[in-house]
Amino acid sequence: MAIESSPPFLVGQDGLKGYKLRTCTIIGGRGFQGRSLVSCLLLLNDWNIRIADSDPSLVLDPTELVLVDALNSRRISYHQLNRLDSSLLLETIGSSSAVFFVDFPCLKNLEFVELHEIIVEGTKNVIAACRECQVRQLIFISSADVVFDGSHSILNGSESLPYQIRHGDILMDLKAQAESLVLCANNIDNLLTCVLRPSTVFGPGDPDIIPFLMCSVKYGLAKFIVGDGENTSDFVYCENVSHAVICVVKALDYRMTSVAGKAFFITNLEPFPFWKFVSLMLEGLGYQRPIIKIPATLVWYALLISKCMQINISTSARLFHLATRTRTLNCSSAQNQIHYEPVVSMEDGIRMTIQSFLHTEQNAAFSEMEEHSKAAKLLGSGKVADILLWRDERNTFVCFLVVFSLLYFLFLSGRTFASSFPIRIRYFG
C-alpha cells in the first residue's frame, strides 16, 4: 500500500504545478454536506477526491453534471463503504493525506444499539484506519447541538461549553461521543484531528429544515408561530461549512499546534431571528408567513403524545427546541485560528436554497392539491369539514386548543380520574 509520508503544501485556485495532487477521502460524501464539500474541493484543483458512502454505486442528480468531467479525468472516484468493515476502510482510506468525516448514513428508525454501532463504533474504526494508513489529517463535522440541551438558551456561547446529555435526542448524545473520540485521537501516530460544529446548516438539498416546513404546510401547521417568536439563532450555509473545512486543512498545514485537537463553532456570523428565517423560506416558496402564535407548552405536549403513539419525533423535537430558544454562538476562535470568514451571506444563502427547492416544490404542490381535493370530496361541506380542512382558521384553532387542554387535564397532568371529575364538571357545566 502506497503511503504519502508528508503532503505537499496547498496552493491557490490555479492548482498544483509540478506537484502531485493530494488525495482525500470524504466519508459521507453523498450526503447533504458531503456534496457541497466535493463541489468546493473540485474548484480548488488541488485534490484527487474519493467519495465514500453506503450506496452501492454513484448515481448523479441532474444538478451534478459538473462531476461527470471529474469522474472521466479520474479526479473523483466512488467507493462503497461500511464503517464497520475495517478491511474496506483501509482499502478506501489508504494513501489519503486527509480524511473528511462529514456524515453518517441514514439513521432513521434505528434502535439505540444500531445507532451506537454506526456512530460510535464506526468512528473508532475510522480513527484506527487513519492511524494505520498514516493519514495526516482527520476533520470531523459534528454539530453545535452537542452543547445545546434544548431547555436553556445560549447567548454568544463559546467552545468551552460542556457536552449536554439530552435524553430525548440520542443521536446528538452519540455524536458528542464520536466527536470526543476524534479529539482524543489527536497527535497519536502523527494524526492531526479537528472538529467543526456548524450551527443549523441549510442549503440546496437540506434534508431537515425545508422538508419539515413543507410537511407543516401540507398539514396546515405552517401558519403557526411556536412561542413568542422573538428568539434568535445562528445558521450557516452549507458552502460556508465546506469553506471552513478547507480553512482547517490550511491551518493544520501551517499552524498545527494552535488548531489540532480542537473544536470550532461555525456560523454565518449573522445571528438571525428564527421565525424571520422561517417566514422568508415559506414566502420564497410561495406560501404565507406564519402569523398565529401558540404556546410552546401546547406544542410540546402534542410532541409527547406523538411519542407515546410511537411516532418518530426526533427531527420535530430538535426543531421545536430551535424554534423556541435563542442560540447564538461565538465564532471568534474559528476566525482567529483558522481564519474562517463566510463566503456566502445569509441573504444569498436563503435565496439559493429557495431556488433549489422551487422545482421540487412545484411538483409536490400538485400532489398536495390532489390530497386536499380527495379529502374535500370525502368530507364534503359543513361545519365539521370546515374545521378539519382549515377553511375556518379561527374555529379550527379554538378546537385545537380545546382538544389539547382536555388531553392535558384528563391524561397528562398526573391527576386520577376522580380528581379530574371536578374539572370536567367545571368545563362542561
Feature annotation, model-predicted:
Residues 1-98:
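N-terminal Rossmann/SDR dinucleotide-binding element
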Residues 2-17, 23, 333-336, 345-369:
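Amphipathic terminal alpha-helices
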Residues 72-121, 129, 133, 146-150:
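NAD(P)H-binding glycine-rich loop region in Rossmannoid oxidoreductase-like domains
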Residues 121, 125-173:
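Conserved Rossmann-fold NAD(P)-dependent oxidoreductase catalytic core, especially the SDR/UDP-sugar
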Residues 166-194:
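Active-site Tyr-X1-5-Lys
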Residues 185-251, 281:
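NAD(P)-dependent short-chain dehydrogenase/reductase
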Residues 251-315, 352, 361-368:
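Mid/C-terminal beta-alpha module of Rossmann-like enzyme folds, strongest
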Residues 369-429:
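Membrane-interface amphipathic segments
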